[in-house]
């Protein structure tokens, strides 16, 4: 059977192997991609974190605008196996394309390095900071000072054909 997923997953949820899931638009796991300005807001994001569990052998297909966005404080538990990998791909049958859907984005409270690093994550004195992510306006905020931040498990997972372009030098 098939099931279309869209919007925000705001409670613990499991994708089951017997269903082929289609990501339509941006599918957010949790609501942690907001700008955090206080310890109370940070605590609320952490307390509101949810887990999306994907069973081994599950197939997830992204529509042209499909993106799975795992926000700060939430987790993706995608624990496949060598005989039953979890597969993310586009709607077509082949695995030979690129840019056919968005992809999978992990945000979190880990330090941000590289392009766009303003040093804010290291100078704020807080466990959170707010870095605008690449890939489009929907990505919003991520980042923090927790080097051991954990956004879940990704084991025996194939991610094919992704790469949404939001603008020049701005893509997933």
Residue ranges and their predicted role:
Residues 1-172:
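Beta-strand/loop edge motif enriched in small/polar residues
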